[in-house]
Amino acid sequence: MAAIKDENNDHLVQSDNPEHPSNLIPALCRNFYSHGWVTGTGGGASIKRDNHIFIAPSGVQKELIQPHDIFVLQYPTPKYPPSARQYIRKPVELKPSACTPLFLAAFDRGAGCCIHTHSQWAVLVTLLVEREKGPEGCFEISNIEQIKGIPRGKGKGMLGFFDTLKIPIIENTAFEEDLTSSLEEAMEKYPDTYAVLVRRHGIYVWGDDVAKAKTQCESLDYLFQLAVEMHKLGLPWVKS
């Protein structure tokens, strides 16, 4: 088992700077709760700063998270087994996030922040894609202005109005951590993606930094909601 230097290593999460990860994560979670993305303790967020990973805890009402609730991991750290992960701060009586290995997969791709939501719009589009395209289909949409808020890929700029945004979809599992291999396979198959949908569950979104991850998550949720409404009206998501 990895050694823990100090379970109460509080200086890592104490800062007056609102941009510090231990302050940003609670602020993000409150924001996401207001959108209905992290209700019932679901969802989460993680930020990488230098060689530290800051992660929201599991099983905690996300709108009530405080800086002292944040877990801190040394990075890099093994995804598996959980006992090998190098926590340098573990809040007493709180559980590490079950999303941890999935967040680590995003950080291994160079992300600075990863967000997981249980957005209803994300769940609905996974069901619509399954019905229309089958279980192997991905979400696609084009000719919508908000697509410009999503990157083409690392160092490739942003998508344009006439481009087709593609987001892969993976199947849900009984346990969150068991999604990791499917998530990594989707990342390999779609190397330019900054998000992966999980059918009947939600979405993982990552970005180069906190602001990009947040705005990309917002843009995607807008597009998912729009796609559901377009479907009701019989409008195609991809313009021919």
Curated annotation (Swiss-Prot):
Question: Where is this gene product found?
Answer: Cytoplasm
Q: Which residues form the active site?
A: 145 (proton donor/acceptor)
Its keywords, alphabetically, are: Amino-acid biosynthesis, Cytoplasm, Lyase, Metal-binding, Methionine biosynthesis, Zinc
Q: Does the keyword Lyase apply?
A: yes
| Metal-binding found in the keyword field | yes
Residues reported in the UniProt entry to bind Zn(2+):
116, 118, 201
* A Pfam family it matches: Aldolase_II
Protein's organism: Ajellomyces capsulatus (strain G186AR / H82 / ATCC MYA-2454 / RMSCC 2432) (Darling's disease fungus)
**Catalytic reaction annotation:** 5-(methylsulfanyl)-D-ribulose 1-phosphate = 5-methylsulfanyl-2,3-dioxopentyl phosphate + H2O
Q: What is this protein called?
A: Methylthioribulose-1-phosphate dehydratase
Tell me the cofactors it needs.
Answer: Zn(2+)
Its GO biological process annotations read: L-methionine salvage from methylthioadenosine
Q: What class of enzyme is it?
A: lyase
Coiled-coil stretches? none
